[in-house]
Every structure is written in structure tokens, then in C-alpha cells.
């Protein structure tokens, strides 16, 4: 009998082992769809981004008008741009759900997979930030100025570092050029990191909603989960295309329709919605260095999660107190997101400060304590 090329060919064998014959737990729920959705998001963003880059000019005098030209004069340029801009939002929606799933079901106990995932999140955040600067509108310019300026809080080398990043003494043409180069490069880095992420995942196999070893009950990835993933793609593309076609500017800032002007500061400088929770934490501390450290900690805290797991059970499926705490954390993040979009005045300042303290308290203090408490409850 001739050998099956799918199982013998050096390249196809790898594809087969990760997408076709991959043994998968039979009980993984729709929360496990977001990984593949992130892959689709990445491919969509790279494709639309490549098409946009063909019509974009990375120069301060031409960037804004080149984006306008793409939308007005390029065949379906408006659609490509709208899909790319809103695709970024969906990318972040998916990654936040994906991280939430990992937190809830204890997937972080696969430490290598979790850590590469956090690095992926940081790279994605960097990519989205440099990408937001490219249209060279008011919010692009001032966002770049404010966020890069945060590095000046680093003692001793801060100011030098910022001027080195800018390529001058303010955000200008060199900054835009290098941000475009970075925005082109980073998605391919994300693609490479994704392969490492998957390599680590396939070492251990997928986790499942019960958090127990599922080797005795695994099914092939294809056709069961390929079909389930296609359903997921459809359910994601539907709202994405609806948003891109009917209300493409819903999530954007109107300020970005004004070309960048270093002489006029917008009344409210704020990032895109997916960074607002971190921005709120940054603003909550009335000290530059303290704020920057809290901002960094708000994301880097994810690296600590595996070490703070004190429960005997892996998932929260049978841990009601931890579940309650988890949903309080979700609500807290939504409050931070809302506060980040509001002006810096009473009562938003105190709400932001309380929500910031709550965020770190839940993750660093309450989760381990409740985990240990639930271990005690198992004895009764």
C-alpha cells in the first residue's frame, strides 16, 4: 500500500500533525475558538495592511493625504482601510477573550505557552500603537507624543531614549518613517511567535473545561474542530463586515480627521478603546514614573499568574468563589475602560484609582487567598 503523502511528506506531515490528525479533547467549548480566530485576524490584517502599504506614503507632508487618496480613489480602498482599522478592534476583542479563557480555565499552568502568549500580546499592543500613528491625524500625532514621552520617566537614560526613539527633538518625519517600518515588520514577528506558541501548546495538548487529563477521550481536529472553527470565522466576520460597511468610524476618534498640527493640542488625548484600561491605570497615579510602572505592571502582571495559582483544581468550573472574583475582575476592567475615556476630573479620578487598586488586589492577593480557601473547603 502506498504511503499517505499527508503523513509522509516532511512539510505536509507538520501541517497534518497540527491541523488535521491533532488529538483534541472532545469537550472543549466555544471559548477555545478564539485561538483560531486570532490566526484569521492576523492573516486578514497582514493582507489588508499589505494592500494599504502599496498606497501609503510615510512622510509627514503626504501621509494624511495618501490615506485620504486610498479611501477616495483606490478601488475598494475605503473598504480595505475600514476592514484594517476595525479588524484591529476585533483582534483585541479576540485576544482579551482568549486571555480571559486562559485565566478562567487555568490554561496558564502551561507556563511556556502562557508566557509566549503574553509576549504576543505585548507585540500586538506595540504593533497597534505604531499603526495608529500612521494616518498622521491629530490623535495619531498627540498619541505618539504622549506615549513615547512616557519613556522619559525612566531615570537617567529616559530623555536620551525618547529622543533616540523620535529621531529628533519632537515627533516628526523620522518618527513616522520608523513607525511605518516597525508596523510593517511586527506582524510577521507576531506570525513567527504564533508558531512558537503553537509548538509549546502541542507539546502538552489542549486544556479543557474540566481541567483534567483528557488523553482517554481525544478526537481528531479535522473534521470536528475545523468545522467548528469555520462557524467561528463566520460569526466573527459578520459583525466585522457590518461594522466596516455601516459604521466604520464608530470606534475611531473624530479628532483623527484633522491633519496633525504640533501647535494645537486636542482637548482630550486618549488612545483607541482597547488601550483605555491601561491608560486609566496610568492616569490614576499622580506621578509620572509611578504611572508608567503601574501601566507596565497592568500587562506584565500576566507573567506572574502561573505562580499565584494556589488551588488544587485547575479550572474555576467547580470553584464558585473564584468565579465570582473572576467576573468582578471583568466588570472592573470594563469600569477602567470607561474611566479611561472620560476627562480627568471628579468623580472619574477617584473611580479610576479605586478600580486600579481593585485590579491589582484581585490578581495579586484575592485569587491566591480564595484558591487556598477553596482547598480547605474541599475537606468539608
Swiss-Prot record:
It is found in: Mitochondrion inner membrane. The chain crosses the membrane at residues 34-54, 78-99, 114-134, 179-199, 227-247, 289-309, 321-341, 348-368. InterPro entries: Cyt_b/b6_C (IPR005798), Cyt_b/b6_C_sf (IPR036150), Cyt_b/b6_N (IPR005797), Cytb/b6-like_sf (IPR027387), Cytochrome_b (IPR030689), Cytochrome_b_C_euk/bac (IPR048260), Cytochrome_b_N_euk/bac (IPR048259), Di-haem_cyt_TM (IPR016174). A ubiquinone binds at residue 202. Binds 2 heme b groups non-covalently. Gene3D superfamilies: Cytochrome Bc1 Complex, Chain C. One of its GO terms (cellular component) is mitochondrial inner membrane. Heme b b562 binds at residues 84, 183. Pfam families: Cytochrom_B_C, Cytochrome_B. Its cofactor is heme b. One of its GO terms (biological process) is mitochondrial electron transport, ubiquinol to cytochrome c. GO terms for molecular function: metal ion binding; ubiquinol-cytochrome-c reductase activity. Its main location: mitochondrion. Keywords: Electron transport, Heme, Iron, Membrane, Metal-binding, Mitochondrion, Mitochondrion inner membrane, Respiratory chain, Transmembrane, Transmembrane helix, Transport, Ubiquinone. It is a multi-pass membrane protein. Heme b b566 binds at residues 98, 197. The cytochrome bc1 complex contains 11 subunits: 3 respiratory subunits (MT-CYB, CYC1 and UQCRFS1), 2 core proteins (UQCRC1 and UQCRC2) and 6 low-molecular weight proteins (UQCRH/QCR6, UQCRB/QCR7, UQCRQ/QCR8, UQCR10/QCR9, UQCR11/QCR10 and a cleavage product of UQCRFS1). This cytochrome bc1 complex then forms a dimer. Belongs to the cytochrome b family. Heme 1 (or BL or b562) is low-potential and absorbs at about 562 nm, and heme 2 (or BH or b566) is high-potential and absorbs at about 566 nm. Component of the ubiquinol-cytochrome c reductase complex (complex III or cytochrome b-c1 complex) that is part of the mitochondrial respiratory chain. The b-c1 complex mediates electron transfer from ubiquinol to cytochrome c. Contributes to the generation of a proton gradient across the mitochondrial membrane that is then used for ATP synthesis. This is Cytochrome b.
Amino acid at each position: 500500500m502506498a504511503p499517505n503523502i499527508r503523513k509522509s511528506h516532511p512539510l505536509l506531515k507538520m501541517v497534518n500533525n497540527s491541523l488535521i490528525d491533532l488529538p483534541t479533547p472532545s469537550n472543549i467549548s466555544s471559548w477555545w475558538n478564539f485561538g483560531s480566530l486570532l490566526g484569521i485576524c492576523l492573516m486578514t490584517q497582514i493582507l489588508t495592511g499589505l494592500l494599504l502599504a502599496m498606497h501609503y506614503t510615510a512622510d509627514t507632508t503626504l501621509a494624511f493625504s495618501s490615506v485620504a487618496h486610498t479611501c477616495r480613489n483606490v478601488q475598494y480602498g475605503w473598504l480595505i482601510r475600514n476592514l484594517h482599522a476595525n479588524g484591529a478592534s476585533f483582534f483585541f476583542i479576540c485576544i482579551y477573550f482568549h486571555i480571559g479563557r486562559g485565566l478562567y480555565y487555568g490554561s496558564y499552568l502551561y507556563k511556556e505557552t502562557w508566557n509566549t502568549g503574553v509576549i504576543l500580546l505585548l507585540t500586538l499592543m506595540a504593533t497597534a500603537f505604531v499603526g495608529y500613528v500612521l494616518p498622521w491625524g491629530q490623535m495619531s500625532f498627540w498619541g505618539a507624543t504622549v506615549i513615547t514621552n512616557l519613556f522619559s520617566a525612566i531615570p537617567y537614560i529616559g530623555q536620551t531614549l525618547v529622543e533616540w526613539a523620535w529621531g529628533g527633538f519632537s515627533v516628526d518625519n523620522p518618527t513616522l518613517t520608523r513607525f511605518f517600518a516597525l508596523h510593517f515588520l511586527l506582524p510577521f514577528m507576531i506570525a513567527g511567535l504564533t508558531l512558537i506558541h503553537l509548538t509549546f501548546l502541542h507539546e502538552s495538548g489542549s486544556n479543557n473545561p474540566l481541567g483534567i487529563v483528557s488523553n482517554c477521550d481525544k478526537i481528531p481536529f479535522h473534521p470536528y474542530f475545523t468545522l467548528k472553527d469555520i462557524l467561528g470565522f463566520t460569526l466573527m466576520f459578520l459583525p466585522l463586515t457590518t461594522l466596516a460597511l455601516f459604521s466604520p468610524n464608530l470606534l475611531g476618534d473624530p479628532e483623527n480627521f484633522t491633519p496633525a498640527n504640533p501647535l494645537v493640542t486636542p482637548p482630550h488625548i486618549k488612545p483607541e478603546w482597547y488601550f483605555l484600561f491601561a491608560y486609566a491605570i496610568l492616569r490614576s497615579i499622580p506621578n509620572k514614573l509611578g504611572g508608567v510602572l503601574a501601566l507596565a505592571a497592568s500587562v506584565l502582571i500576566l507573567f506572574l499568574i502561573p505562580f499565584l495559582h494556589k488551588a488544587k483544581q485547575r479550572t474555576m468550573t467547580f470553584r464558585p468563589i473564584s468565579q465570582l472574583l473572576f467576573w468582578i475582575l471583568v466588570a472592573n476592567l470594563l469600569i477602567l475602560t470607561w474611566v479611561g475615556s472620560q476627562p480627568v476630573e471628579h468623580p472619574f479620578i477617584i473611580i479610576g484609582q479605586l478600580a486600579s487598586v481593585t485590579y491589582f488586589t484581585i490578581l495579586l492577593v484575592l485569587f491566591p487567598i480564595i484558591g487556598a480557601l477553596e482547598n480547605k473547603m474541599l475537606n468539608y
